[in-house]
Amino acid sequence: MSMHKEADKVSTPRYKPYKGPAGGWGALISVAHFWLTSDNALKNIRTMLKTNQNGGFDCPGCAWGDSPESGMVKFCENGAKAVNWEATKRRVDASFFARYSVSSLLEQSDYWLEYQGRLTEPMVYDAQTDRYKPIAWDDAFALIAKHLNNLPNPNMAEFYTSGRASNEAAYLYQLFVRAYGTNNFPDCSNMCHEASGVALSQSVGVGKGTVTFEDFEHADAIFVLGQNPGTNHPRMLEPLREAVKRGAQVVCVNPLKERGLERFQHPQHPLEMLSNGSEPTNTAYFRPALGGDMAMLRGMAKFLLQWEREAQANNEASVFDHTFLNEHTNGVLEYLAAIDDTSWEFIVEQSGLPLSDIELAARMYAKGKNVIMCWAMGITQHRHSVPTIQEVSNLMLLRGNIGRPGAGLCPVRGHSNVQGDRTMGINERPPAFFLDALEKRFQFKVPRENGHNVVEAIHAMLEGRAKVFIGLGGNFAQATPDSPRTFEALSNCDLTVQISTKLNRSHLAHGKEALILPCFGRTDIDIQAEGPQAVTVEDSFSMVHASNGQLKPLSPQMRSEPSILAGIANATLGKQPVDWLWLVADYSRIRDLIADTIPSFQNFNEKIKNPGGFYLGNAAGSRRWNTPSARANFKANILPSDLVHESIRGTGIVPDLIMQSMRSHDQYNTTIYGLDDRYRGVKGQRDVMFVNEADIIRLGFVPGQKVDIVSIWGDAIERRVKGFTLLPFDIPAGQAAAYYPEVNPLVPLESVGDGSSTPTSKFVAIKLERHAETARII
């Protein structure tokens, strides 16, 4: 069956709670399905065996690190989906765009759009016909250069980056944009782990995690906060279950009961598969209120302080690591005072947990000599995410759990090189040392004022302060909040440019003029003037390794991201401050520039020859604190007085529910591989909302009924999505969950994290209204 037919075929929607483990036969059947429907099955089987292997390519999925152990299979179910999605033979070429107008494509689902295949030639939008038509590469570059050079101010252009971009592409991009004259780098990290970078930079002096892959083998306790690895980082399940087997505590903190955090059946263990066995992936599971994590962590710290005082009074062993505190930290007394000022009653109320649960979590933490704290979007997409992550750091500092084997901080990143892009300088608020290095090496005046993040870029386009948008990968229109306003912002631009592998909605939410520039993916062989090229990526553990494509590109018109960026830069700036076209003839020349300007990349070209790549190092992981005081900082933040934003409270409307957005299992970011969500029991549908059955009844509905969801915010904008099916689910009362990007229209552009500007997609106040169509599926 072709992918085109597969996308047109929609199974009958149904809902049946899933009772099996994560992984197992379900994962194998899913992988087989995506192989067989890729239109390239035989080649893709061989290609998959090169995933995350030396001499192969880096998985285009998540940023989880590679096991140092060798093996033929180093990919997961969702990695297989990502590879088969990219490595299809199906093409979206000039004939496709001749058949479909942009208006007709807008009526299709995101799933249908992406399953049409790979973009194979550069296209320009023709407003008269409402269609894209072919354009020569040089003409496309000239059009971009004309718009950029005609802007009154370089800050009127926005340069977006997806975490798919390689280190080489990201470095070239930031160099071009800064030579052009702006720091406007709205980046996908602004919408996910921005709070982690901000919080950790202030607390421990580095905006990355401090652990390595090997640390998981030595941890006595692993906490997993606001994360669903079974879907988003499936290869993480193996170290979690191995930790449980060796007697470590694995403590999961998530309002939803996620199957990957309960049990895992390893698809590579034949005996386990044949016996249909599985192993637990946790020793405790706590389910706080949405946004209640900081209160839970503060409660754990309050128990530690109580036990420390009891130990001192009884002349017993200390609970705190006083040697570490004295030698490495600042602000502990102020933090302990903040703990004393926080009442147990307020902690229990805001966390949504009984005091006994908080005490148990604290005892599990205190019992572990070496503790790792992991977290993801459930922590980072709240208004108070920066203080919450600093509370994680505070808790770890009390017992010296940073900078020793088996212990540390682990923000688990999403896209495969989102961390590397930031290392390369994709940052709207770049550090001075990096700008100094660029000026010294390239001899041009680097812009010093902060640029725009994602939310600021949308506001600038809405208000006419930005007129050109260039997207290096991703699906900006669908990944962002307040979707109708984002679409309006893009349509306000004089020019939008999308550098993409596959068709998505961002090509349809376009400016007055628009370009689609088809680029290579991670699986494609990249041959430039000096021969075959490798690119590099950085994972969540600061490991950098090479990636070599394995498949011949579908069209000679497709180009690599570095080649496209060099073409744009050459047309816009000429050979200033570098010869762009000479650089991309051999990517080792780009890596030499990286080595000249970014710490820890000395001898870059030699280091990537090492099997498995090389470790960048981590100052905080070595107990070197890059803070003004050269110490790690306790942050005595107060808990939010109210989790509900004043703009919601000011309406006088009492929310029916607080909703979080999330992915399905057949999804990676905005890429929809299918319409099923196996672990949650959903088949053939995405317009659903998971709600506690008691809440469904309390609100006057019945399970399976369709509703409209209306967001509450203190402005005159109606934010509504229609026809969502209510599914009864094991979720705490008062909470709800639904898939993005479908519910992104409900997230106000103004509702962002303090200090991070990340949209608060995990805390959306909503009302439910009856939908005109009352058909039920259960």
Segments from the language model and where they lie:
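Low-complexity, highly charged intrinsically disordered N-terminal segments
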Residues: A82-R131, F141
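Short cysteine-rich clusters marking metal-coordination/redox-active sites
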Residues: G56-C62
